[in-house]
């Protein structure tokens, strides 16, 4: 792992399980850290709301802040119509954020560095918003493919472009998140490996540089969860507005 910065993204089997319809369903390091991420969110929420005090403590205040934060994002993008979809957006944000931050721990595994995970999450968002769109607007939901004011001669090309862009949403959403996680962790690993090989880890400037890189990657982890959530709300706004 010290020589190969991409080794940290390799999936390893922890518990081998019988195949299901010819497919491997082994319990891997990805499965483990995904479970850790989910349990972390559940514990954060349960411990935060267990007392329900009028004057909240630090943990309850944190839970309330996250909830208010998600509510404000939904309202600013979809209006009051989108508030009933808080469970989806809240789950997307907390799960993505938890996976990103857990991946920053030493000897951990970054679940969101794998496109298959981010694509599955993106497909949930894509499918949900599409169903909501047809449920709210019926066949009129297809009007998002043809903006108002487009000349009739340009309409077929515009419909094709908009349809392609719409179907590409889960792909772009998933690749954006995974690519940022891979890039950040790889840079940290490469720089840290170089510094250690040069025996500079105990000198002040390289040590502080590594700390700064880690701090920046934590910021990126939070930012990417935020961007993923914002885009989810934007897609939701097409369905409910």
Swiss-Prot record:
Question: Where does the protein end up?
Answer: Cell membrane
Species name? Wolbachia sp. subsp. Brugia malayi (strain TRS)
**Ranges that cross the membrane:** 29-49, 86-106, 114-134, 144-164, 177-197, 200-220, 221-241
Query: Assembly and interactions?
Result: F-type ATPases have 2 components, CF(1) - the catalytic core - and CF(0) - the membrane proton channel. CF(1) has five subunits: alpha(3), beta(3), gamma(1), delta(1), epsilon(1). CF(0) has three main subunits: a(1), b(2) and c(9-12). The alpha and beta chains form an alternating ring which encloses part of the gamma chain. CF(1) is attached to CF(0) by a central stalk formed by the gamma and epsilon chains, while a peripheral stalk is formed by the delta and b chains.
Name of the protein: ATP synthase subunit a
Major localization class: membrane
> Pfam families from the entry?
ATP-synt_A
Family per similarity comment? Belongs to the ATPase A chain family.
Q: Which InterPro entries match?
A: ATP_synth_F0_asu, ATP_synth_F0_asu_AS, ATP_synth_F0_asu_bact/mt, F0_ATP_A_sf
Q: One GO term of the cellular component aspect?
A: plasma membrane
């Amino acid at each position: 792992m010290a020589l190969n910065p991409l080794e940290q993204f390799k999936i390893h089997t922890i518990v081998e399980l019988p195949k299901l319809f010819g497919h491997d369903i082994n319990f891997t390091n990805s499965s483990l850290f995904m479970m850790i991420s989910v349990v972390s969110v559940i514990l954060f929420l349960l411990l935060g709301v267990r007392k329900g005090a009028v004057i909240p403590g630090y943990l309850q205040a944190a839970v309330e802040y996250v909830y208010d934060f998600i509510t404000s994002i939904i309202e600013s993008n979809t209006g009051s119509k989108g508030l009933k979809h808080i469970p989806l957006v809240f789950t997307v944000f907390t799960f993505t954020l938890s996976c990103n931050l857990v991946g920053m721990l030493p000897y951990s595994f970054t679940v969101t560095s794998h496109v298959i995970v981010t694509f599955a999450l993106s497909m949930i968002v894509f499918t949900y918003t599409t169903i909501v769109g047809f449920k709210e607007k019926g066949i009129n939901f297809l009007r998002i493919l043809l903006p108002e004011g487009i000349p009739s001669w340009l309409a077929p090309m515009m419909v094709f472009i908009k349809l392609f862009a719409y179907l590409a949403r889960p792909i772009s959403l998933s690749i954006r998140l995974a690519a940022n996680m891979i890039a950040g962790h790889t840079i940290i690993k490469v720089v840290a490996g170089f510094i250690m090989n040069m025996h500079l880890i105990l000198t002040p400037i390289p040590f502080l540089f590594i700390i700064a890189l880690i701090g920046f990657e934590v910021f990126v982890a939070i930012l990417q969860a935020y961007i993923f959530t914002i885009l989810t709300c934007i897609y939701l706004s097409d369905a409910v507005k």
